[in-house]
Structures are given as structure tokens and as C-alpha cells.
UniProtKB/Swiss-Prot annotation:
SUPFAM superfamilies: NosL/MerB-like
UniProt KW Cell membrane keyword: yes
Record-stated family: Belongs to the NosL family.
Signal peptide positions (record): 1-23
Lipid-modified sites (N-palmitoyl cysteine): C24
The gene coding this protein: nosL
Description of what induces expression: Induced in response to denitrifying conditions. Activation requires NosR and DnrD regulators.
Organism: Stutzerimonas stutzeri
PROSITE patterns listed in its UniProt record: PROKAR_LIPOPROTEIN (PS51257)
Name of this chain's protein: Copper-binding lipoprotein NosL
Annotated localization: Cell membrane
Taxonomic path: Bacteria, Pseudomonadati, Pseudomonadota, Gammaproteobacteria, Pseudomonadales
Keyword tags: Cell membrane, Chaperone, Copper, Lipoprotein, Membrane, Metal-binding, Palmitate, Signal
Length: 190
């Protein structure tokens, strides 16, 4: 009876370990994916704690193996990323392609690699924290927005803390203002 009991307990332990290891492997595999994820109504900005979907304009996210950090604006994400300790993280950065989205509610189906995006800085459009850096996959879309709403087109590597501070000061405390009337699309034709 003891031998039978030990065999049953040993078998049960082996089965539990097998399921446990399989479960760990699956969980690890999901976390290793560095693909963008959708924004949800309950998501809060990693920097300021605001509900992300309550505000217009492009958003950002940093996807790591340990999880996803979401941001209410591209400016918030870029400001976070430019901190020296964050640049050491193995994270992939994403922003909305505003060439394929409406300003009031960017489409999560069009999240692009932030490091290869074109950014329009100094537009009249406002995002969650006032200053907005409109993000685009295509340079011609960025130039079209700059032509309609002002600003200049920059690449990811041209953005630094001084530029983000300059963009914020241009908004004159426009924090949480929504896009002006008629600014429904990031640019005409999309």
C-alpha cells in the first residue's frame, strides 16, 4: 500500500510539475512578445496617472518583457524615454500613426515604431498634456499636417528634453485642451 501510495504521489507530482513548467513557458512566451497592445478605457498614463483615452492626440507605449508602460501623449513617452535610466531598458517604443487616425481617437490598429516615425512639433493641435508631437509613419503625411497646423517635422533622434520643454512652453498652459474645431483629422485626405 505504501509503495502504491508513493507511486501515485510521484506520478501526481510529475504531472503537476509538467503542467507548471508548461504554464510558465507559455506565460514567458507571451511576455517576450514586444508587439504593441491596444489602449483601454481604464489605462492610466505611466507618468502622470491620467486616464489615457480621455484625451485626443497620439499616444505612446513602451513594451518590455516585464510588461507595457502606456502614456497619454507622445511627449510624455518621449520625456520618459529620454531619462538615462529608461534608455537602458530593453523596450520597444510605439506611437500612433496620425496619417491613418483621427485626432480625437487615434486608431490602435495603426501603432508604429516610434524610433522610425516622423514627428511634427509646434502644431496648433493639442493633446493630453497640451504640447503635442504628432507622429507619422510617412514623411509626406507629417509635412501635410505641418502645412495645415504649423510646426516643423523632426525625426526621433532629433528630439531631446530641451525640445520637449520648448514645445510645452509654446502651448502656454493649454494642458488638457482638446483639438480646435475643424481639426478632426490629423490631416486632410485620411
Amino acid at each position: 500500500m505504501n509503495a502504491l501510495h508513493r507511486i501515485g504521489a510521484g506520478t501526481l507530482l510529475a504531472v503537476l510539475l509538467a503542467f507548471g513548467l508548461t504554464g510558465c513557458g507559455e506565460k514567458e512566451e507571451v511576455q517576450q512578445s514586444l508587439e504593441p497592445v491596444a489602449f483601454h478605457d481604464s489605462d492610466e498614463c505611466h507618468v502622470c496617472g491620467m486616464i489615457i483615452t480621455d484625451f485626443p492626440g497620439p499616444k505612446g507605449q513602451a513594451v518590455e518583457k516585464r510588461g507595457v508602460k502606456k502614456f497619454c501623449s507622445t511627449a510624455e513617452m518621449l520625456g520618459w524615454w529620454l531619462q538615462p535610466e529608461n534608455r537602458l531598458l530593453d523596450a520597444k517604443l510605439y506611437v500612433h500613426d496620425m496619417g491613418r487616425s483621427v485626432w480625437e481617437k487615434p486608431d490602435d490598429g495603426h501603432l508604429i515604431d516610434a524610433t522610425s516615425a516622423y514627428y511634427v512639433v509646434g502644431t496648433s493641435l493639442k493633446g493630453a498634456m497640451g504640447a503635442s508631437l504628432a507622429s507619422f509613419a510617412e514623411e509626406q503625411d507629417a509635412k501635410a499636417l505641418a502645412g495645415m497646423h504649423g510646426g516643423r517635422v523632426l525625426r526621433f533622434e532629433e528630439i531631446d528634453q530641451a525640445l520637449l520643454q520648448e514645445a510645452a512652453s509654446m502651448q502656454h498652459g493649454g494642458m488638457h485642451d482638446h483639438a480646435p474645431n475643424g481639426a478632426h483629422n490629423a490631416h486632410a485626405g485620411h
